[in-house]
């Protein structure tokens, strides 16, 4: 601040009668914030140095020829307040005072310029430069020494300097603000010193060294009046001048007093922060020093609490005191007094054993720390020290403090307290000395050590007849068993261990000895005055000294509390070692270690563990007998009680004695379980259970939420049920303290009904054991039932209810009765019960047609509460019904050896149990149903393996002509309904409803076979069947080929070589050749089974002949054909070898669907298959390593089973609920804080670079006038909403430079301080890629620019203040912002508006509509990304012209001008671009990935081989619960964020081939299982292996008259969680890939065609926007094309038949697509699936296919 103030006024010139001298203005780059606490002590010195180093330009200091020419006073120096300046004159040292120098009655009448009146003023000579201050000037405010009377300078030395050489005086600067007055006073005092007036400056006591003369008073007044205008004076100065306007001395005196106080505070803070203590000085002196500093700071308003003070003290401890850092740092309530207690004890022990010579040597294997216990009757002291360092500091202590601890030749001056060796110290409490008084032992101020004891001292006791001491270190000639009886004042015996001599070595160098008794059982060390008197020593309490009768002073006495003390340092230590002293003890208990000490020493272990460890010698140095165990049993350690606090223990059976008085149904336990996630809306998410205490009867009720009204309804129901059914009244309900139970609504309800709520205590779930155990039991049963039955999870509550019914009927081992028996109910009739999930057939009493089947397959759940029926789940209708019209599905097969639940049945047992129930299906109906069952619902594989000796035709009762099995073998099996013993589908539609309503009348007759050439799974080979089969003929078609289908399955005549379609092997009987079944995609299966309504791509009836294929509409005109050829010609599509068309025989058309059995979510999707993979032999290439599709046992009959939901893979769920106590996920931080980059940075070179960057940033902030430097604001005066924190962040840029940035904490910015409507725009990546593509095709020059500190060019409109960073130490000050600082919410928008306005108005650019940050004119295109600019132009001079205009306003740096005709390399927004005009452009990130990927800690190349694809089909992500602790979970989530973040950045920039894998793994960031991490590692590994790959562009043919913009679309149907489809699009401009997108469809599609329509609808808007951009940047005509491999989608888009739009949403979407295609001249064409490069966006592909689709555009 001061140097800044000086620089602002350094242009003041010295005007005189003989010269006009001007000084060069000095600019400074000092950071106004950089005033940290560490620099306070240097502040005055730095201020003086700044004054002394101000220089002038030699050329401007020349003196005019006429020495008597008077120049006018500069305008910057205002005239005196009482009038203008009179005629000026000058004076030299060798001349007499002029006439104007005489004293006048009023000082304002003096006719001279004040600084010319200084006795030290000299005019400059003709050839001399402007005078400078001496380079070394003492600080004017330094504390005076006792010898010098002047505070600031020695006048005699100044006079001698004045006689030897001329000294020129510069005037002080002008005062411009009241806040600058303290700094101005310093410069003014310096001015007086240099003017030889240092003697009149007041000292610290307020009085000057000499009397001020009248002339000097006049000079003082006038200079003060001129350079300190009254309007800028502080209030307290004005108050002084209002009393006496000439009392400048009083102002100076008070200013010095204030400055001294500030300096003292700064010095105290620095001293406290740099404390050092190793025992070389007395502990009481160190304590006095510290406590005085703390007291002074507290008195001055700087509060230092105990925690901070203790930390500062402990940080400075060294030597034997260092261990206190580790023994004390865990204590939360530690005080300074307690810390000094241990310091005094160690010092006392250290001094006592300084000269002792131990008579034992420690074994090196002994423990490092030696523990000693010092017992005290008031408070024991426990000391732990290192005996190996006992005498290390001996010589050092003696030299530093003249304290002798040796018996050999003590010096005369040892331990003397003299003024010459003691520095003065200031104390601020009642025990302190006056200013300048010396510190003596009689005035030591101590804190309480133990009660009122003064550590390290002996208490002078006039009533004691003997001297007693607790420590044996000072006893000479000790002897044990003295036989002396000693009693205290209360007549209690004091056991004496030894007697000896106590030897004193006083400061007069005399030695004295008295008798002393040793005992550890006293509170103080007592020194008997009677025994001192016996050796001619008395205590004088008036002088506070011990003296002899002749008046010789021996030692000072210290008064502490109510007693007088003498220091132990006058005692001579004995030569007795510690073990010898222990042998002197006679009491066994006094020689043992106290248990509390051992307990604390051994990490607070319990007494039993410690005793066992000592007994087994696992702890050495002392034995079990060395510890006093008497207090171990009853000892309560407060730290253990706090640190090891646990919940109270529950005694088994303790609950019963409180509830014996209750009758049945009077005492209930209740609890709520939930929520269960990822369920349809109709399914309950919670259940509430009730248990009767007496009978243990249970009730469960489903809940959809935990609202008060929902809970109240259940309570009302259960209370009414108990009252009416059991004639009982509930008296007490026990529950936990959840908000659902403690709300006011339920509390009032219970109070109204007279029920007492009994709540558990806080966090005591074990007290609620009855309800908790019931919930656990029911959930265990639920999981088991769902696993056994295979039913979907949304039926979980049905399993709970089934378990409740059974559990109420089972007897308890304790009571020998069931809950139903205790309640007086009959036992459960098991004949009415079915196994949970038992397959049944339910009668459809209201079919659509008389010829439709009457049976619907379902699963039995539990008996109905409201009827005599059974609750049965019908998957095909997605409903549950309450009915008695059902029949159990039976079968004889079972495979107990494999424990196959799907085959395991107990039909005979079920028949016996249900014998009394008659089936609604007649015997002839059973036979008839079996005859119609032409498609088996069994797993072919399992059927053949179960009965190899008797193969059974599972397709039909008829026998194949080629089947060798006689028809009679099937007769017995055909008499009963075929068993459908399979698992139910795991997942169903989320909109499934649970109701008791049977299917409605309006239903589709049969499932519709959809387009066989489906593309959702990657496409199939074209089959020789109708693509759009008529719905009315589908049944006939299937029926007519039943026998053919059957014949095919049992025929050996079919050869694998007849088709290229993927075949699945099926085991045959008796060693016959394997039969093959063509693989049919899951999409086809779903269409055949699920869809009841007409297919969206259904067309009018056509001939069923396999030779008639319905063609897709194609362009009929020659122009359209040419356009199609033109669009497809330049695309980077794969080159495929020609293949001959293959037709499947008719039997293939009627094969039942075969589903892939999958239990996990697939990385590649559900049931993905690929059209490019052909299996013509048993051997398979490594590149075609697809997972082999197996025949599913879950295949259901599509005719008789009525569209049962096919099995699907499990949902991919982010099971965050399984993670225990996850609170927050911290974002990833890539920058460093100030303390990390500079303060604690151990890398010196890096630290220096960051410091350099820091100063560079500070200078830039000052240069840009980022804030108002004229005023600092008090934090209390500003609205907190407008105050924003700030910080410095540091990072290393990609080019290796180190960057520092001063930013605001916009993340905590208040919403009222910015306009949320303003947006910060940057160039879209598609816009940049489009511009680069056009630049290549048109031979443009590409120039890259950077604008330094861009945001700081934008002004800020709002009134905002920032708080300086913490490391600057200005916590209470604020600065008002003037510029848009980085980090503010509005900074980006302000900069965007600023640069946008400049580009439009000054550079003649215009922004492209719809594409922010893209500007153009007739010659130049600009892409703006914050402060980076990319210029495109055909003429390089046009770019240079824009650069010249930008440099007029902004600090613009040219990164790459782009003028070379050779290959030029760019780094544009992370893309490494190689560009040669007119030839090619390559985009990659090799250097960046080479640097970043190794830092991710991913194991690269673990097997030493490179991956060929980022993933493979057939990989599935398990949904097992993620049991992991919070810290590990956060760590893994952070790792996933880093890995997926980098992958997303790379994929979005140019690696579009990775987007599908990135998108899929990004959905699992919050589910970081081991499997997910491994898949992510594999993706990063592939990126590492292919880091050198580049997106290759070549210049378009010059003959092309048009720009061609193409979007290639693809979709993968239902391969994402919740049956969502994956859609993908790739965009190409003139054959160059400029962008790609892979995402999950926002809505659930019900067919492949719908998914394709959704994908196309996502591509068209962006295609139109890109078309507009291309037309704006390049005036060529443009052709827009859209390619898809779905012919049905093209047919619907081009069709005018609105009947195809069979549902509201997709019908509307398809109609909109049709309008957009026709209205935007968009060409839609078909592309073969094999050539669809967008396939990589929607599914995982085999290596061969992946390479085939990508090697044309990225390699």
UniProtKB/Swiss-Prot annotation:
Where's the motif Bipartite nuclear localization signal?
1178-1212
Q: Where is this region: Disordered?
A: 1-93, 126-173, 352-421, 956-1087, 1092-1111, 1130-1187
Q: Can you tell me which residues form the catalytic site?
A: 461
User: How is it modified post-translationally?
Assistant: Initially, virus-like particles (VLPs) are composed of the structural unprocessed proteins Gag and Gag-Pol, and also contain the host initiator methionine tRNA (tRNA(i)-Met) which serves as a primer for minus-strand DNA synthesis, and a dimer of genomic Ty RNA. Processing of the polyproteins occurs within the particle and proceeds by an ordered pathway, called maturation. First, the protease (PR) is released by autocatalytic cleavage of the Gag-Pol polyprotein yielding capsid protein p45 and a Pol-p154 precursor protein.
Q: Which stretches does UniProt call biased (Basic and acidic residues)?
A: 1038-1053
Q: What does the record give as the function of this protein? A: Capsid protein (CA) is the structural component of the virus-like particle (VLP), forming the shell that encapsulates the retrotransposons dimeric RNA genome. The particles are assembled from trimer-clustered units and there are holes in the capsid shells that allow for the diffusion of macromolecules. CA also has nucleocapsid-like chaperone activity, promoting primer tRNA(i)-Met annealing to the multipartite primer-binding site (PBS), dimerization of Ty1 RNA and initiation of reverse transcription.
This one is known as Transposon Ty1-GR2 Gag-Pol polyprotein
């Amino acid at each position: 601040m001061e140097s800044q103030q000086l620089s602002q006024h350094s242009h003041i010139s010295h005007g005189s009668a003989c010269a006009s001298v001007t000084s060069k203005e000095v600019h400074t780059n000092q950071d106004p914030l950089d005033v940290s606490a560490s620099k306070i002590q240097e502040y005055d010195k730095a201020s003086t140095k700044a004054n002394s180093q101000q220089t002038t330009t030699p050329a401007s200091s020349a003196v005019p020829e006429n020495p008597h020419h008077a120049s006018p006073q500069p305008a910057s120096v205002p005239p005196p307040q009482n009038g203008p300046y009179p005629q000026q004159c000058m004076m030299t040292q060798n001349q007499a005072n002029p006439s104007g120098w005489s004293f006048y009655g009023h000082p304002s009448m003096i006719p001279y310029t004040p600084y010319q009146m200084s006795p030290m003023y000299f005019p400059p000579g003709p050839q001399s430069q402007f005078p400078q201050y001496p380079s070394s000037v003492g600080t004017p405010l330094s504390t005076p020494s006792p010898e010098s009377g002047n505070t600031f300078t020695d006048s005699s030395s100044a006079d001698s300097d004045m006689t030897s050489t001329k000294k020129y005086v510069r005037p002080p600067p002008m005062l411009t603000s009241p806040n600058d007055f303290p700094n101005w006073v310093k410069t003014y005092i310096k001015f007086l010193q240099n003017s030889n007036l240092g003697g009149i400056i007041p000292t610290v006591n307020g009085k000057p060294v000499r009397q001020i003369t009248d002339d000097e008073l006049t000079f003082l007044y006038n200079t003060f009046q001129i350079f300190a205008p009254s309007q800028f004076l502080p209030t307290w100065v004005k108050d002084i001048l209002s009393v006496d306007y000439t009392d400048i001395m009083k102002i100076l005196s008070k200013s010095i007093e204030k400055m001294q106080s500030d300096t003292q505070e700064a010095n105290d803070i620095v001293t406290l922060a740099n404390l050092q203590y190793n025992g070389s000085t007395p502990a009481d002196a160190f304590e006095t020093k510290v406590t005085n500093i703390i007291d002074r700071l507290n008195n001055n308003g700087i509060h230092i609490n105990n925690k901070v003070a203790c930390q500062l003290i402990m940080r400075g401890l060294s030597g034997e005191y260092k261990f206190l850092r580790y023994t004390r740092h865990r204590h939360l309530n530690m005080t300074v007094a307690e810390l000094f207690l241990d310091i005094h004890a160690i010092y006392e022990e250290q001094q006592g054993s300084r000269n002792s010579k131990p008579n034992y040597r420690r074994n090196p294997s002994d423990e490092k720390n030696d523990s000693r216990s010092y017992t005290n009757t008031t408070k024991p002291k426990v000391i732990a020290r290192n005996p190996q360092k006992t005498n290390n500091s001996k010589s050092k202590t003696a030299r530093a403090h003249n304290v002798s601890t040796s018996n050999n030749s003590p010096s005369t001056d040892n331990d003397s307290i003299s003024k010459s060796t003691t520095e003065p110290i200031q104390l601020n409490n009642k025990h302190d000395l006056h200013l300048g008084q010396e510190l003596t032992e009689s005035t030591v101020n101590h804190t309480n050590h133990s009660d009122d004891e003064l550590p390290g001292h002996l208490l002078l006791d006039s009533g004691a007849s003997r001297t007693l001491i607790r420590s044996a270190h000072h006893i000479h000639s000790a002897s044990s068993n003295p036989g002396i009886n000693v009693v205290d004042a209360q007549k209690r015996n004091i056991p004496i261990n030894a007697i000896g001599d106590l030897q004193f070595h006083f400061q007069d160098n005399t030695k004295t000895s008295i008798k002393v008794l040793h005992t550890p059982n006293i509170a103080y060390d007592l020194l008997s005055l009677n025994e001192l008197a016996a050796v001619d020593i008395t205590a004088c309490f008036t002088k506070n000294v011990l003296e002899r009768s002749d008046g010789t002073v021996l030692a000072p006495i210290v008064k502490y509390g109510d007693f007088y003390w003498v220091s132990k340092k006058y005692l001579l230590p004995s030569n007795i070692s510690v073990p010898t002293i222990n042998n002197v003890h006679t009491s066994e208990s006094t020689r043992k270690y106290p248990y509390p000490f051992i307990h604390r020493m051994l990490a607070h272990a319990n007494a039993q563990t410690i005793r066992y460890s000592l007994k087994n010698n696992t702890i050495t140095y002392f034995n079990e007998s060395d510890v006093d165990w008497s207090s171990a049993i009853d000892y309560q350690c407060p730290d253990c009680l706090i640190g090891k606090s646990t919940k109270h223990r529950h005694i088994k059976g303790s609950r019963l004695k409180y509830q014996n008085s209750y009758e049945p149904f009077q005492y209930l336990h209740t609890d709520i379980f939930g929520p269960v996630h990822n369920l349809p809306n109709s399914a309950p998410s919670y259940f509430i259970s009730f248990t009767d205490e007496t009978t243990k009867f249970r009730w469960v009720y489903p809940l959809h939420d935990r609202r008060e009204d929902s809970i109240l309804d259940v309570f009302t129901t259960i209370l009414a049920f108990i009252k009416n059914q059991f004639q009982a009244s509930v008296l007490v309900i026990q529950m936990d303290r959840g908000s659902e139970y403690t709300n006011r609504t339920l509390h009032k309800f219970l109070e109204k009904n007279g029920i007492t709520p009994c709540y558990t205590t806080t966090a005591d779930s074990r007290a609620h054991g009855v309800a908790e155990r019931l919930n656990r039991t029911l959930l265990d049963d639920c999981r088991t039932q769902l696993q056994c039955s295979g039913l979907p999870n949304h039926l979980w509550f049905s399993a709970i209810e089934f378990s409740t019914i059974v559990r109420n009927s089972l007897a308890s081992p304790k009571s020998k009765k069931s809950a139903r028996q205790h309640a007086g109910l009959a036992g459960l009739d098991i004949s009415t019960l079915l196994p949970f999930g038992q397959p049944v057939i339910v009668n459809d009493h209201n079919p659509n047609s008389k010829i439709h089947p009457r049976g619907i397959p379902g699963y039995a759940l539990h008996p109905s509460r409201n009827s005599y029926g059974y609750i049965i789940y019908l998957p095909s209708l997605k409903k549950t019904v309450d009915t008695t019209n059902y029949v159990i599905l039976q079968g004889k097969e079972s495979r107990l050896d494999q424990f196959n639940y799907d085959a395991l049945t107990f039909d005979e047992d079920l028949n016996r149990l249900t014998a009394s129930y008659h089936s609604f299906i007649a015997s002839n109906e059973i036979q008839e149903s079996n005859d119609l069952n032409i498609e088996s619902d069994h797993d072919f594989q399992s059927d053949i393996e179960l009965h190899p000796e008797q193969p059974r035709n599972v397709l039909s009762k008829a026998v194949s002509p080629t089947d060798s099995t006689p028809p009679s073998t099937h007769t017995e099996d055909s008499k009963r309904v075929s068993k459908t013993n399979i698992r139910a589908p795991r997942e169903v539609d989320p909109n499934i409803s649970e109701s008791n309503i049977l299917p409605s009348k309006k239903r589709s007759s049969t499932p519709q076979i959809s387009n066989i050439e489906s593309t959702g799974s990657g496409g199939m080979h074209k089959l020789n069947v109708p693509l759009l089969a008529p719905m009315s003929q589908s049944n006939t078609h299937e029926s007519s080929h039943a026998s053919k289908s059957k014949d095919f399955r049992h025929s050996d005549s079919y050869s694998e070589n007849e088709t290229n379609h993927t075949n699945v092997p099926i085991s045959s009987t008796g060693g016959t050749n394997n039969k093959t079944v063509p693989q049919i995609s899951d999409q086809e299966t779903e269409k055949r089974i699920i869809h009841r309504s007409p297919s969206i791509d259904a067309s009018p009836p056509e001939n069923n002949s396999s030779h008639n294929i319905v063609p897709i509409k194609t362009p009929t005109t020659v122009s359209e054909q040419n356009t199609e050829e033109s669009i497809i010609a330049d695309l980077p599509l794969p080159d495929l070898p020609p293949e001959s068309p293959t037709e499947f025989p008719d039997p293939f058309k009627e094969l039942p669907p075969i589903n892939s059995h999958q239990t996990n979510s697939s990385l590649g999707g559900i049931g993905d298959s690929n059209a490019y993979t052909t299996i013509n032999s048993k051997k398979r290439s490594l590149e075609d390593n697809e997972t082999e599709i197996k025949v599913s046992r879950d295949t259901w009959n599509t005719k008789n089973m009525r569209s049962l939901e096919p099995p699907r893979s499990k949902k991919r769920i982010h099971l965050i609920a399984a993670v225990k106590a996850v609170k927050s996920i911290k974002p990833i931080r890539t920058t460093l804080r100030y303390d990390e980059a500079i303060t604690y940075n151990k890398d010196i070179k890096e630290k220096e670079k960051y410091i350099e960057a820091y100063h560079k940033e500070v200078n830039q902030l000052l240069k840009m006038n980022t804030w108002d430097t004229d005023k600092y604001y008090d934090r209390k005066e500003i609205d907190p909403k407008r105050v924003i924190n700030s910080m410095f962040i540091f990072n290393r840029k990609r080019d290796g430079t180190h960057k520092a940035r001063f930013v605001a904490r916009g993340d905590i910015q208040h919403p009222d301080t910015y306009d949320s409507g303003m947006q910060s725009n940057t160039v879209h990546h598609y816009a940049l890629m489009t511009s680069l593509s056009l630049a290549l095709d048109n031979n443009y020059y590409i120039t890259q620019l950077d604008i330094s500190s861009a945001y700081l060019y934008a002004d800020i409109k709002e009134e905002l203040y920032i708080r300086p960073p913490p490391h600057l130490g200005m916590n209470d000050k604020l600065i008002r912002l003037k510029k848009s600082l980085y980090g503010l919410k509005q900074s980006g928008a302000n900069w965007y508006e600023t640069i946008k306005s400049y580009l439009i108005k000054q550079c003649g650019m215009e922004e492209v509509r719809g594409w922010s940050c893209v500007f153009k004119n007739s010659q130049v295109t600009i892409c703006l990304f914050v402060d980076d600019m990319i210029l495109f132009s055909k003429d390089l001079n046009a770019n240079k012209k824009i650069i010249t205009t930008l440099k007029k306003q902004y600090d613009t740096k040219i990164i790459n001008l782009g003028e070379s005709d050779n290959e030029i390399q760019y780094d544009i927004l992370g893309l490494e671009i190689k560009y040669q005009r007119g030839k090619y452009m390559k985009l990659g990130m090799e250097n960046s990935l080479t640097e970043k990927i190794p830092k991710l800690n991913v194991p690269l190349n673990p097997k030493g081989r490179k991956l060929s694809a980022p993933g493979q089909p057939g990989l599935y992500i398990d949904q097992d619960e993620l049991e992991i602790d919070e810290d590990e979970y956060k760590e893994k989530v952070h790792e996933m964020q880093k890995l997926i973040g980098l992958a997303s950045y790379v994929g979005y920039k140019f690696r579009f081939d990775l987007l599908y894998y990135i998108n899929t793994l990004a959905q699992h960031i919050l589910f970081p299982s081991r499997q997910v991490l491994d898949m992510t590692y594999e993706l990063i590994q592939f990126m590492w292996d292919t880091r050198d790959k580049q997106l290759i562009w070549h210049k378009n043919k010059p003959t092309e008259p048009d720009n061609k913009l193409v979007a290639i679309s693809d979709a993968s149907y239902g391969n994402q969680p919740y049956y969502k489809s994956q859609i993908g699009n790739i965009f190409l401009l003139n054959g160059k890939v400029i962008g790609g997108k892979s995402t999950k469809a926002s809505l659930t599609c019900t067919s492949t065609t719908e998914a394709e329509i959704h994908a196309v609808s996502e591509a068209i808007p962006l295609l139109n926007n890109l078309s507009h951009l291309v037309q704006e940047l390049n005036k060529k005509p443009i052709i827009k094309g859209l390619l898809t491999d779905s012919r049905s989608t093209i047919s619907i888009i081009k069709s005018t038949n609105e009947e195809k739009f069979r549902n509201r949403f997709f019908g509307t979407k398809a109609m909109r697509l049709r309008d957009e295609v026709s209205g935007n001249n968009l060409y839609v064409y078909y592309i073969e699936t094999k050539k669809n490069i967008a396939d990589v966006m929607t599914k995982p592909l085999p290596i061969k296919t992946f390479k085939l689709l990508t090697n044309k555009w990225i390699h």
